[in-house]
UniProtKB/Swiss-Prot annotation:
Domain of life: Eukaryota
Lumenal side stretches: 27-373
PTM text: Isoform 2 is N-glycosylated; consisting of high-mannose and/or hybrid glycans.
Side of membrane Cytoplasmic, spans: 1-5
Intrachain disulfide bonds: none
An example Gene Ontology CC term for this record: membrane
Other noteworthy facts: For isoform 1 inhibition of MGAT1 activity is demonstrated in vitro upon forced membrane-association. Its rat ortholog is the most abundant protein in testis Golgi preparations.
Family: Belongs to the glycosyltransferase 54 family.
Expressing tissues: Isoform 1 and isoform 2 are specifically expressed in testis. Isoform 2 is expressed in spermatocytes but not in spermatids. Isoform 1 is expressed in spermatids.
Glycan attachment points: N29, N54, N144
Organism for this UniProt entry: Mus musculus
Protein name: Alpha-1,3-mannosyl-glycoprotein 4-beta-N-acetylglucosaminyltransferase-like protein MGAT4D
GO biological process: cell differentiation; negative regulation of protein glycosylation; spermatogenesis
């Protein structure tokens, strides 16, 4: 009896072991299938990532190609500008070809890509180039208010004859109103005949072709955002025109006055700088007034302004490009700003004061003053 019970016990244990073995084998097969499926998913994911990587590399190569083309274009413009700077105080003849630095606009303004050669309309110019300083003044119609004659009188009368010989003042009429252009040209030729004849004073105008159609729409002419966008484009076109003419470019506006001997002080200060690492010099703290750039750097500035011309006013973009070019990645902004004095140089006291009260934006008044003037 005892032996029988033992045999039954062994049989029961054997059945349990067999069942457990079958269960384990079944689970192992399921696990193996899961592992195979998992491996297939991993391989599939790896293949997808590889395709994405190849696509990313292709896009990266395309982007680098575009940037390379832009860099070549900028280098060509800079070399062309250098050829002009070698001709100190020279006058361009009618047979000399101007560098087509305006082609860069086609990269950023799609409506210009089918246009031919781009260049502002010349109202009056003797083609002066190879001087030390180009002073750019952008102007638009302010209705019954005008400060341009006062500005030009202040800027030109406070130059010595030698300083006039070494500079060019460019008035850019950035207004679609043809009658305003005619009134500016008439005023300039009447009140500043000597400077026009000597070549120190030029007047250009920006054809409507340069602007996107949305900015020419009547509905946007009184829109503040559109006005700011157009102002960025106006300044960029003026910078490109002035670039091959001088070693330095000074941005002014059409409603300012200059201090006595401003030109002498500006020239002496620039020549006294021992460091050549400066980014730009501020001869006024207001907006974009009195900002001095090296002409060879203008291409980089214009590229940046055109990339973001629809997002911010130009004086804010100037702050942005300063932070991008000077600040180290990951560096606290405060630490960067402490080092800015060597790159963004501020001259005191300011050499220019804002005098206009009627803004170039329709219907707006502004009473901004430079407290350091």
């Amino acid at each position: 009896m005892k032996a029988k019970n033992v045999n039954l016990l062994f049989a029961f244990v054997a059945v349990l072991l067999f069942g457990f073995s079958c269960f384990c084998i079944s689970r192992m097969n399921q696990t193996n299938n899961q592992l195979i499926n998992c491996r297939n998913h991993v391989l599939e994911f790896k293949e997808i990532m590889l395709r994405l990587k190849n696509k990313s590399e292709n896009h990266h190569q395309d982007l680098m190609q575009v940037l390379y083309q832009m860099k070549r274009k900028a280098a060509h413009t800079t070399r062309s500008s250098g050829n002009f700077l070698e001709k100190k105080g020279s006058i361009l003849s009618q047979h000399e070809t101007l560098p087509n630095q305006f082609e860069v606009l086609k990269y950023f303004l799609p409506h210009l890509r089918t246009a031919g050669k781009l260049y502002p309309a010349i109202a009056t110019s003797k083609g002066r180039a190879g001087v030390s300083f180009a002073l750019g003044i952008s102007t638009i119609n302010r209705g019954n208010h005008t400060y341009l004659k006062q500005t030009l009188t202040s800027v030109l009368s406070r130059m010595t004859p030698e300083e006039e010989e070494d500079s060019v003042v460019i008035v850019s009429v950035a207004d679609t109103d043809e009658s305003y252009l005619k009134s500016v040209v008439r005023m300039v030729k009447t009140k500043f005949r000597k400077q026009v004849q000597s070549g120190v004073l030029e007047v250009i105008s920006i054809p409507t072709l340069f602007y996107p159609q949305t900015l020419l729409d009547k509905k946007t002419k009184t829109d503040s955002e559109s006005w700011q966008i157009k102002q960025v484009l106006d300044f960029c076109i003026l910078m490109l025109y002035a670039q091959p003419k001088a070693t330095y470019y000074l941005q002014l506006e059409d409603d300012i006055v200059a201090k006595k001997m401003y030109f002498t002080k500006m020239k002496d200060f620039v020549n006294s700088l021992t460091s050549k690492n400066w980014f730009f010099i501020e001869f006024s703290v207001l907006g974009f007034i009195g900002k001095l750039f090296r002409s060879k750097d203008l291409t980089d500035f214009v590229h940046f302004f055109l990339m973001f011309y629809e997002t911010k006013p130009i004086d804010i973009l100037l702050d942005d490009i300063f932070l991008i070019r000077v600040c180290i990645s990951g560096e606290p902004v405060r630490s960067c700003l402490q080092r800015k004095k060597g790159f963004r140089i501020q001259y005191r006291p300011s050499l220019f004061q804002h005098v206009g009260t009627q803004s170039s934006f329709p219907g707006r008044e502004q009473h901004l003053k430079d407290n350091y003037y």
